[in-house]
């Protein structure tokens, strides 16, 4: 059996050894809940990695959003390169659920765009849980939404062993049952191609390997894994298991039983609607449902098949839907990162989904059984959650009520102490901020500024830009990937100041930031609560010269508690450093770390090495350019290459070219 192998050059330090020991003790003692109260930059992820390596249990890591999930995925992947670290988040790039607005008689059709790469990673995650004990799944709140039941899913898997008697046509039929399609021209995920007695199959959950089955006289002579791009055989295999293309694939007999159940419910619902003189709703429901039934009968699925999940999973009315938690082994561990945000998210999902579906049922767009296609309720989630570790710098009320043990991790391994907190008058906050920014920019450090409203953030950004500050504004309309790019550019020094409202808090890892400025800190409310203030102050805790300035005309209760807690932690950290002769060291972290491994579909290490080599050669060549005409000519050449790469969908390489062009244009101004 595979074991978790933690690969790192670091040893636990500061508060980490004691925190790891206490958490492992708590898990082995059977504590249902523990809280790791760890300050920003104290290495909470490293401590959790050590706990996983010691207890040797499959682990589900729940993050509050995709950005943090991607960051955690990259970190765990680096800690456990020889184990199954997987990424399970919503596979929708865009999702518009079906809805009905009775006031305007408007029906909105379901519309969605599925990210193929994330769908592959989700399938890979469930496969890892079913096949291996050494699995770490990094997920978001999407893990509480309905998924095909593991029992049905496992009934559909196809095992092929070398030496098996296997009729070729029977094999192709089984692959079709798994919703794989034959495509001899375009060999992609969840497709297969046939060349005589050789069948190439690209598994739905695989990113870089396809499987070749060679038959001789209806016997499996050879099974091998090969690179679908080059055709190079990677290794020979004694056996292989093929999983369905979707978690919702269902055996034929279950589908036939489900169709009968749906017909019975449809008849009952039609009688109810007609008896209440809702003839339009009855006609609409009958037409839509019979169309779905016909599709299921012919193709094995239909658009919106998840609305019939009660029948497909065989669960009684009102029962909790099958979710990712059903795939977890009994001895699994649950780690909830930034639990003060993640736990309330779990509770919020059910009610919004319910009210939308009740309208659809009432007006004849769906059968009442569609209400069972839903996320888990909070009490159901509590019932299926395994042993749990809450991780947060500012635990919420739920954690306080359920914490069997609170483990503090206040002292950082680097010796860094919490930032100094100053309170300054709000009357002159903008001018004072401008002078502080000038000081930080002079020593190549970065600044975060948090305001109360969008309007205020926009006005401040314009004002700073007018005074020659390189500034950007981060707001809720910016999508996840662009947000990550903005944070990356801040760290790289493309600009110096980032202004935001509520997006500069949990988990963002920016060691270059030495100043956090909180405007109007005395305006009590959600954005200036004790928890929000501590989290925002913590953004400067990874820098040796970290400082937080709160602009306020009075000290509120939240400010007093936040400053008091920061001072308590700071005093403890300084005392530990003095007692152990530790000199604080700044954090140095590779900028490429932010979303490594979770955003680039089908990325191959060879391709990345080639791109890095090309970038080095470009840099050498560009340093030799002297005259403005040479630089201008080079810019034109690179622009042509960049547009060609974009046309070839090589966006990562095109982005590198764009960065090179920007540098050359800056040089052109100084030549």
UniProtKB/Swiss-Prot annotation:
Forms a heterotetramer with UvrA during the search for lesions. Interacts with UvrC in an incision complex. This is UvrABC system protein B. A motif (Beta-hairpin) lies at residues 91-114. It comes from the Bacteria. It comes from Pseudomonas fluorescens (strain ATCC BAA-477 / NRRL B-23932 / Pf-5). Residues 429-582 form the Helicase C-terminal domain. The UvrABC repair system catalyzes the recognition and processing of DNA lesions. A damage recognition complex composed of 2 UvrA and 2 UvrB subunits scans DNA for abnormalities. Upon binding of the UvrA(2)B(2) complex to a putative damaged site, the DNA wraps around one UvrB monomer. DNA wrap is dependent on ATP binding by UvrB and probably causes local melting of the DNA helix, facilitating insertion of UvrB beta-hairpin between the DNA strands. Then UvrB probes one DNA strand for the presence of a lesion. Residues 632-667 form the UVR domain. Keywords: ATP-binding, Cytoplasm, DNA damage, DNA excision, DNA repair, Excision nuclease, Nucleotide-binding, SOS response.
């Amino acid at each position: 059996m595979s074991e978790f192998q933690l690969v790192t050059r670091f040893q636990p330090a500061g508060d980490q050894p004691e925190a790891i020991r206490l958490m492992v003790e708590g898990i082995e003692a059977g504590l249902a809940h523990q809280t790791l109260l760890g300050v920003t930059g104290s290495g909470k992820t490293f401590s959790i990695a050590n706990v996983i390596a010691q207890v040797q249990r499959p682990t589900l890591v729940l993050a509050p959003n995709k950005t943090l999930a991607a960051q955690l995925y990259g970190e765990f992947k680096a800690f456990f390169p020889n184990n199954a670290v997987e990424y399970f988040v919503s596979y929708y790039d865009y999702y518009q659920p079906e809805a009905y607005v009775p006031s305007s008689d408007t029906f909105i059709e379901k519309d969605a765009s599925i990210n193929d790469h994330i769908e592959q990673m989700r399938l890979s995650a469930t496969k890892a849980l079913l096949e291996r004990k050494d699995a770490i799944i990094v997920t978001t709140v999407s893990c509480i939404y309905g998924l095909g039941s593991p029992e049905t899913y496992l009934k559909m898997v196809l095992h092929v062993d070398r030496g098996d008697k296997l009729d070729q046509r029977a094999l192709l039929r089984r692959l079709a049952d798994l919703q794989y399609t034959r495509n001899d021209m375009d060999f992609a995920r969840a497709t297969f191609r046939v060349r005589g007695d050789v069948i190439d199959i690209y598994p739905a959950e695989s990113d870089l390997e396809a499987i070749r089955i060679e038959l001789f006289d209806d016997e499996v002579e050879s099974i091998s894994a090969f690179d679908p791009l080059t055709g190079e055989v990677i290794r020979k295999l004694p056996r292989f298991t093929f999983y369905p293309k979707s978690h919702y694939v269902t055996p034929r007999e279950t589908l036939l039983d489900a169709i009968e159940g749906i017909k019975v419910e449809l008849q009952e619902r039609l009688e109810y609607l007609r008896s209440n003189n809702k003839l339009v709703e009855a006609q609409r429901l009958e037409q839509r449902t019979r169309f779905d039934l016909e599709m299921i009968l012919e193709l094995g699925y239909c658009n919106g098949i998840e609305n019939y999940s009660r029948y497909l999973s065989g669960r009684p009315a009102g029962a909790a839907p099958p979710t990712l938690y059903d795939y977890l082994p009994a001895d699994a561990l649950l780690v909830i990162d930034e639990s003060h945000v993640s736990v309330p998210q779990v509770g919020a999902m059910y009610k919004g989904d319910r009210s939308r579906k009740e309208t659809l049922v009432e007006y004849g767009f769906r059968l009442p059984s569609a209400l069972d296609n839903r996320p888990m309720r909070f009490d159901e989630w509590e019932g299926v959650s395994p042993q749990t570790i809450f991780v947060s710098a500012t635990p919420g009320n739920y954690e306080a009520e359920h914490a069997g043990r609170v483990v503090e991790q206040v002292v950082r391994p680097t010796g860094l102490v919490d930032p100094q907190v100053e309170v300054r008058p709000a009357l002159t906050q903008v001018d004072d901020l401008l002078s502080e920014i000038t000081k930080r920019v002079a020593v190549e450090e970065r600044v975060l500024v948090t305001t109360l409203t969008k309007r205020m953030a926009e006005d401040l950004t314009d004002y700073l830009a007018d005074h020659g500050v390189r500034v950007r504004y981060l707001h809720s309309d910016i999508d996840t990937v662009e947000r990550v790019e903005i944070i990356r550019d801040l760290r790289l020094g493309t600009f110096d100041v980032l202004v935001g409202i509520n997006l500069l808090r949990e988990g963002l890892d920016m060691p270059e930031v030495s100043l956090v400025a909180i405007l109007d800190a005395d305006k009590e409310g959600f954005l200036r609560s004790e928890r929000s203030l501590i989290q925002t102050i913590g953004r400067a805790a990874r820098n040796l010269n970290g400082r937080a300035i709160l602009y306020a005309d009075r000290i509120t209760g939240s400010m007093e508690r936040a400053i008091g807690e920061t001072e308590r932690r700071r005093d403890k950290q300084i005392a530990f450093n003095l007692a152990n002769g530790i000199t604080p060291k700044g954090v140095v972290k590779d900028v490429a770390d932010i979303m490594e491994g979770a955003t680039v579909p089908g990325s191959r290490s060879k391709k990345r090495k080639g791109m890095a080599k090309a970038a080095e050669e470009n840099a050498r060549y560009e340093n030799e350019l002297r005259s403005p005409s040479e630089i201008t000519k080079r810019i034109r050449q690179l622009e042509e290459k960049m547009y060609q790469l974009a046309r070839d969908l090589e966006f990562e390489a095109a982005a590198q070219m764009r960065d090179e062009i920007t540098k050359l244009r800056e040089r052109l101004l100084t030549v």
